[in-house]
């Protein structure tokens, strides 16, 4: 049946996305300029933020790059922000972009080692609760020294490997190397229930690991990009940063691990799914088969990948180079010493991260609108105007948390620390209050932001990864599964800010672990970030 040219244009627009979704995006594109020019640029700015969140929430209907990109292009075209401001945002976040381009590809070339290690862990630990705690704790520990995105890239890589192994067998193609694990049409009805249970099992492990990256990432100055910016503004070194955060991070970490145990035991919010016995048998058979067929060439590859893993951890922990450049070194070393020298063999490694890199560039265009239209200014001004110091600390934590749920936590943390730094330099607040506020900003941007994928880049990467549709992990499901953690982390963090922060900081001063800061010790350079 032939189709008219007009209908062909409509059908091609956003491809297989539902018609209602296409109409919604077109409506946004019509409404935004009208609101910007005839109502109020501030309102139009917030409208754009809400619309962009909508495209993220519908990630399984349509990858957010296309609809979000159209909204961003229009925003620049009508003057909500400028190409220069977008470029400034991209330059300021070049390390994150390099990380996505190179580090995620680097992890791809270490798949064999990761599957080897994690298969042993998955088969070795029979208790789902113990396994969940192991994933959460390991992710937290690694995120304290590495980047959360790198940790999530590792976990995603492992989960895709596990999923593909079972899916191949469930589809009756156990020996096939070219099996398509994204297609369920060959899955036997008897194994379909196991497949659903297995998906739920993998979803819960991924969410535990995702929250683990937030629990660990808040603790050290290298854990998250905004931590580095905050530490730089306050003039804190690695050890001092950890100690200053302890009144909040220690109780939050303990309660986070307890939450991990509780949700698994109670089976709430999508947790509690156990590894089906049939799947365990398949993974055990796979492991035995791999062990039997492993040659010296395979062993040599595993040894090389192990040595590269050591370099990766040492390089990142000591910050020997930008994360992305260390990732590039991993690609070069892993391919050179394992014999991957064809261009098409290398291309697959970049497939996972490049669409997300493009999406992040669009995200920074939205951040540019937030800056140019001063969308957060009323909130920041209101919090800074509060006289009571204790209330100001709590409000900073809450305001940071709420804004980090809708925007990038790096951006929110940077904006706030720069505003507080300006207040310190103008004599509006004391150095002691500045130090306490810096802790409130750091914990506020890192902890409550687990509520939605917008706040944590690692969560956003997980949501838009090739793995998410395989295990049916949608935006709504992520928010629902993160809910127990969001409540516990946000409330315990708030409790720590109100009751523990001031007395414990004073105690650390008395013990001589840290010294009270002076205005001179805070670096005067406003971060190059924003």
Swiss-Prot record:
Keyword annotations: Antiport, Cell inner membrane, Cell membrane, Ion transport, Membrane, Sodium, Sodium transport, Transmembrane, Transmembrane helix, Transport
Swiss-Prot/TrEMBL catalytic activity: 2 Na(+)(in) + 3 H(+)(out) = 2 Na(+)(out) + 3 H(+)(in)
GO molecular function: sodium:proton antiporter activity
Compartments where located: Cell inner membrane
One Gene Ontology term, aspect cellular component: plasma membrane
Source superkingdom: Bacteria
Membrane-related topology note: Multi-pass membrane protein
InterPro entries: Na+/H+_antiporter_NhaB
Transmembrane regions: 13-33, 34-54, 90-110, 121-141, 145-165, 205-225, 241-261, 306-326, 351-371, 393-413, 455-475, 481-501
S-S bridge residues: none
Pfam family, one: NhaB
Keyword Cell inner membrane: yes
Presence of keyword Membrane: yes
Role: Na(+)/H(+) antiporter that extrudes sodium in exchange for external protons.
Family per record: Belongs to the NhaB Na(+)/H(+) (TC 2.A.34) antiporter family.
HAMAP family: NhaB (MF_01599)
Protein name: Na(+)/H(+) antiporter NhaB
Upper lineage: Bacteria, Pseudomonadati, Pseudomonadota, Gammaproteobacteria, Vibrionales
Gene (UniProt): nhaB
